[in-house]
């Protein structure tokens, strides 16, 4: 009966002593079967002595209860520990001896209680553990892993600085029947939040012990620059993250404000043909910003100008020359080329499979002067000529209803319009008199208010 432990440092195969310690073997096998040990840390390493594991959270977690037996998982916290009888025949004489970590019972000091944690010896003849730990197995494969664990860097409490964890457990042979209520997971469960919170240095993180602080700082800056370049690529400021500035462009600064493009080109043209020379100016005022970009035809000419023109006096100003770090022109040309390519592809947004959404009610698109075809397309409505003539529905039911209207309806409408237009002259005269009387009363009221105001001022 054997169990394979897949750790972050390698595989360990354990043969179980079923006849000598049946209860401890059953507990260990069933805990492995329900994947209880997955992601459990090796939380204690004592060099040339033992290492201890089996608590899924480890002592660093405030939620840890020290582990539980399989019966505690199935029946509750009352059965979290179980009693073990230590066999006097089993001794810790060989390296790789596997035993359950035990504590004395509070009721009987001679009784030993165990849960899920177990110990693996890293040295021979450790008789100190006899009578304190219950042996139930031996390591038969993976002694190189034991050497790696023995040489791990640890803190003052014996905990590895870099995590050593059990990743998986595989049962090679199980002679025991499953207890009632035991559910075997279909796949290995993911680590819980409490387990992830105990990670110090991840077991898959690579560390270079020979790297000095300066090299590590340089590596950190390179990673940060790469991340920033990737961010600029994502927002569209760079055509791609690995873009480099052109090597045939010089950056010239500390220029005199009166220096012109032609003057600068004439001075630098002695090193070779110049494709462009531009003094950067303010867009609003046109004043020189006192720096320029000079693009040479050849890279060698650009390098020669860099070495020869550093600190040269131009128009009473000593200039500073450096290689251009700008990729703005590159980005602009890349954007223009990309946009033109997309426009030639057809479709919508440069994707031939896409089509602009048409918002319409009618399904047929043959009608030429359809006033209500587009629901929200205001641009189409503005471009469409306005027609004053009234349009009627093409539905046969509505057209027949319109034709079958009563002729009296139009007659009543015309009669009302004629009645409103032909008022009697007497009524119109009465309206005029009423308006005159209202205006006269308003004038009297205003005069009365003015007189009252004057009397108050006199008092």
Swiss-Prot record:
Its EC number is 5.2.1.8. Residues 248-326 form the RRM domain. Keywords: Isomerase, Nucleus, RNA-binding, Rotamase. Residues 1-171 form the PPIase cyclophilin-type domain. Residues 377-392, 417-459 have a biased composition (Basic and acidic residues). GO terms for cellular component: nucleus. PROSITE patterns: CSA_PPIASE_2, RRM. The keyword RNA-binding applies. InterPro entries: CRIP, Cyclophilin-like_dom_sf, Cyclophilin-type_PPIase_dom, Cyclophilin_PPIL4, Nucleotide-bd_a/b_plait_sf, RBD_domain_sf, RRM_dom. One of its GO terms (molecular function) is peptidyl-prolyl cis-trans isomerase activity. Residues 407-416 have a biased composition (Basic residues). Its main location: nucleus. Belongs to the cyclophilin-type PPIase family. PPIL4 subfamily. PPIases accelerate the folding of proteins. It catalyzes the cis-trans isomerization of proline imidic peptide bonds in oligopeptides. This is Peptidyl-prolyl cis-trans isomerase-like 4. The gene is cyp6.
């Amino acid at each position: 009966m054997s169990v394979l432990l897949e750790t972050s440092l390698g595989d360990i195969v354990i043969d179980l002593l079923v006849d000598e310690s049946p209860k401890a073997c059953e507990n260990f096998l069933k805990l492995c079967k329900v994947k209880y040990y997955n992601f459990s840390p090796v939380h204690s390493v004592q060099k040339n002595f033992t290492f201890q594991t089996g608590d899924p959270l480890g002592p660093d977690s405030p939620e840890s209860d020290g582990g539980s037996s399989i019966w505690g998982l199935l029946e509750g916290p009352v059965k979290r520990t179980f009693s073990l009888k230590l066999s006097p025949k089993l001794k810790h004489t060989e390296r790789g001896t596997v035993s359950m970590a035990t504590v004395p019972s509070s009721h009987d000091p001679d009784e030993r209680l165990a849960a899920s944690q177990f110990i693996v010896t890293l040295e021979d003849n450790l008789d100190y553990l006899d009578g304190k730990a219950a042996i139930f197995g031996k390591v038969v494969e993976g002694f190189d892993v034991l050497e790696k664990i023995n040489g791990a860097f640890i803190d003052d409490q014996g905990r590895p600085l870099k995590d050593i964890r059990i990743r998986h457990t595989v049962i090679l042979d199980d002679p025991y029947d499953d207890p009632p209520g035991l559910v075997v997971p279909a796949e290995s469960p993911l680590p819980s939040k409490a387990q992830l919170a105990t990670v110090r240095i991840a077991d898959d993180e690579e560390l270079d012990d020979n790297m000095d602080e300066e090299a590590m700082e340089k590596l950190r800056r390179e990673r940060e620059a790469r991340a920033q370049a990737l961010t600029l690529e994502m927002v569209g400021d760079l055509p791609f993250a690995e873009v480099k500035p052109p090597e045939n462009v010089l950056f010239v600064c500390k220029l005199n404000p009166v220096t012109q493009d032609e003057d600068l080109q004439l001075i630098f043209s002695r090193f070779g043909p110049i494709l462009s020379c531009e003094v950067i100016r303010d867009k609003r005022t046109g004043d020189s910003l006192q720096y320029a970009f000079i693009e040479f035809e050849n890279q060698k000419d650009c390098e020669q100008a860099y070495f020869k023109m550093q600190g040269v006096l131009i128009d009473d100003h000593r200039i500073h020359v450096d290689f251009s770090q700008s990729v703005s022109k590159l980005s602009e040309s890349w954007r223009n080329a990309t946009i033109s390519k997309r426009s030639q592809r057809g479709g919508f947004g440069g994707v031939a499979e896409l089509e602009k959404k048409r918002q319409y009610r009618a399904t047929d698109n043959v009608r030429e002067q359809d006033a209500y075809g587009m629901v929200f397309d205001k641009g189409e409505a503005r471009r469409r000529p306005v027609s004053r003539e009234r349009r009627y529905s093409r539905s046969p039911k509505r057209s027949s209803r319109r034709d079958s209207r009563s002729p009296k309806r139009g007659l009543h409408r015309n009669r009302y319009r004629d009645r409103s237009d032909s008022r009697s002259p007497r009524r119109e005269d009465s309206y005029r008199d009423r308006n005159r009387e209202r205006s006269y009363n308003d004038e009297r009221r205003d005069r009365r208010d003015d007189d009252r105001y004057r009397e108050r001022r006199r008092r």
